[in-house]
Amino acid sequence: MPVRFKKDIQYYKFCLYGFLKNQRFFDPFLMLFFLEKNLSYTQIGLLYSVKMLTRTILEIPTGVIADALGRRGTMIFSYSSYVVSFIVYYFSGNYFFLIVASFAFGVGDAFRTGTHKAMIFEYLKYKSWEDQKVHYYGHTRSWSQVGSAVSSLIAAVIVFYSGRYTDIFLFTLIPYLIGLALLASYPKILEGSGVKKPEQSVTDVFKKVLHEIFSSFKNLKSLKIITSLSSFSGYYMAIKDYLQPVLQTFATALPVLLFLDNKKREALIIGAVYFIIYFLTSRASKYSGRSAEKFSSLLKPLNLILVMGLVTGILAGLFYKFNIIIVSVILFIGIYIFENIRRPMAVAYASETFSDRILASVLSIESQAQSLIAALFALLLGFFADIVSIEFSFIITSLVLLVTTPLYMLKNK
């Protein structure tokens, strides 16, 4: 199917949103930030789980709020929660404040996920470009990955000159405050058809949205679809930051930039690798639509990438175990690429399967499932990393998810 949407002002706003959203300068160094504070992997896993479980608990009600009372306000509240989180991370002096910051970050995620995707699809519906979902979402998502690539270089410079991981949270405030202003400029048509009208009471609006949600999820098939779509993304969210200690080991062993101290050398090498990762994932996301068109239906590539990604996780652990670190790093990069090819397909598949009227809620439920899976596997990864080793934590968690795939693989309608 040829690309036929117009790159208008709103298209560029969506792209700019994705770019600014991923100016998370802490992303390439978050786990190293925690390790520098002498936390165990189990404690780190708990922080990730707090963030994910907060997102899980709040996911469905925030989706309902977005569908029923307005998506722009929901997004603005989300960004405000992120700002609070960054400030607390910056000033955190003990584990309790790290938990508070993780909670605030989880609140921000809960109010954001699903909502912005629904705004994009609302715009496609308004423009009669509904058949362009994979292409359009893939294009806008690719700008998120470009943002991450630029962010990784800026983060490396910040750590290089400051010598402190903490400062990256302070600098992250700048793009997020700009993002707040951008969201406020979105047109009202993106609020969705479920927004409360003057003649309707708030109770009536919520009842209507909730009724449609329960109607969509009253059978096991719908739940199976959500589990299948969210499984690999949840796994990815839990395992992706473990690339950082792997890269730290790689940077220490690499005989380059030896005139610099370890932290400066690690900052430059990790920043450069993450730049390459996000450049590749931006291409993967952008061409997700073309990849999907090679198959007769979306469920085939969704199932295939799920299995390939989990096998890649097992192999990454095995190569790290045998100290072939460069291959382990390359395989980790493969997991990032698989996620960014699969994610636009998953979102498009959900939008084709469920009613447009409750799309924000459906996507929030799917994102909630991601968060629950990520919370569980973050704890498992941390636990096994402490009692056995990091490499075996990769192997065990990937294997657990792989052997259970027959339970939730997508089937023909």
Task: Name what the model sees in each region.
Residues 13-32, 47-66, 70-82, 97, ...:
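Substrate-agnostic recognition of the 12-TM MFS/MFS-like secondary transporter fold
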Residues 1-8, 188-227, 258:
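Juxtamembrane intracellular "pre-TM" segments in multi-pass secondary transporters
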Residues 39-50, 132-142, 167-170, 251-278:
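Loop-to-transmembrane helix entry
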Residues 7-11, 90-102, 318-332:
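Helix-loop junctions at membrane interfaces in 12-TM secondary transporters
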Residues 159-174, 256-269, 383-401:
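A membrane-interface helix-boundary motif in multi-pass transporters
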Residues 80-94, 289, 307-322:
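C-terminal ends and interior cores of transmembrane alpha-helices
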